[in-house]
């Protein structure tokens, strides 16, 4: 399919069916679009909307975000996952405040230099908010292009990604780039979906190789399978009345900057920790274990609950706090921690 025909059909479809009333599309600014694009990485629109609205209510400008404590940013992000995005968001806001006087940059080089912003995200920010001519290549766009032009291979491979970038550059029109880029994302999200694509409703159906051959399932190529390693972590749920001991993780690494229960490799290490602090372990109870899967390994979590009668010996770590179940503080929590806290709120753990 010729590039001009491709873009014309996509734009015509967008004018009729595309999404035009998402929260970040109303009174668009580079800041709003940046925030939405970071949230939309690895996350669907329906999930992102309430998070976006909460962030905009609390941080209406990039300076507000830059001046906020990281704990508060992570707290508002809790549940959205991939927390490195939130840490990079905060770093980038501070960079904008420091280097650009609080005005979101408007050149590709400056936007792409922000933490957590790559080529596609930078292109999306500048094209969607300012109409600047930059192609994009997010997951939805990769899928549309790979199927239409039968580009084989996993897009994570550099040579495959380069082919898709070349196609994206070719089909992105000189005029209407803002509508076109939004249309491509909408097309991938609404029509050219991962499974059960609605080919009969697609504006590209007559020129799409995958549609003609009914081979959409082959494109884009899947990531080579790998067996994820398994690890075990013992979480200590130390509870005093309505409060539970949490400790902040180091700034980088797993759950960086988030609050978590004290974690141990095995039960013996956990009991040693208690003994060193002269905390009796007589009532230590194992709760139901569960699995939490990261992108690179499985973590089998074994919660160990222990009610204590006083705080003595529990607060020797400077990064620890007693988390009030009834009046929770504004701190970021790892998803399994939130799950266990909710379990404690509902009554006796099981």
Swiss-Prot record:
Matching entries from InterPro entries are given as: A/G_AdeGlyc_MutY, DNA_glycosylase, Endonuclease-III-like_CS2, Endonuclease3_FeS-loop_motif, Endouclease-III_FeS-bd_BS, HhH-GPD_domain, HhH_base_excis_C, HhH_motif
What are the positions of the active site? 37 (proton donor/acceptor)
The record's annotation in Gene3D superfamilies points to:
Helix-hairpin-Helix base-excision DNA repair enzymes (C-terminal), Hypothetical protein, domain 2, Nucleoside Triphosphate Pyrophosphohydrolase
Q: Name one GO molecular function term.
A: 8-oxo-7,8-dihydroguanine DNA N-glycosylase activity
EC number assigned by the record: 3.2.2.31
Q: Where does [4Fe-4S] cluster bind?
A: 192, 199, 202, 208
Xref: Pfam families = EndIII_4Fe-2S, HHH, HhH-GPD, NUDIX_4
| Alphabetized SMART domains for the sequence | ENDO3c, FES
**Stored PROSITE patterns:** ENDONUCLEASE_III_1 (PS00764), ENDONUCLEASE_III_2 (PS01155)
Biological-process GO terms, alphabetical: base-excision repair; mismatch repair
Extract the signal peptide range: none
Q: Where is this site: Transition state stabilizer?
A: 138
Q: Which cofactors?
A: [4Fe-4S] cluster
Q: How is the cofactor bound?
A: Binds 1 [4Fe-4S] cluster. The cluster does not appear to play a role in catalysis, but is probably involved in the proper positioning of the enzyme along the DNA strand.
| Keyword terms of this UniProt record | 4Fe-4S, DNA damage, DNA repair, Glycosidase, Hydrolase, Iron, Iron-sulfur, Metal-binding
Catalytic reaction list: Hydrolyzes free adenine bases from 7,8-dihydro-8-oxoguanine:adenine mismatched double-stranded DNA, leaving an apurinic site
Description of how the protein assembles with itself and partners: Monomer.
Entry similarity comment:
Belongs to the Nth/MutY family.
Q: What does this protein do?
A: Adenine glycosylase active on G-A mispairs. MutY also corrects error-prone DNA synthesis past GO lesions which are due to the oxidatively damaged form of guanine: 7,8-dihydro-8-oxoguanine (8-oxo-dGTP).
Q: What is this protein's name?
A: Adenine DNA glycosylase
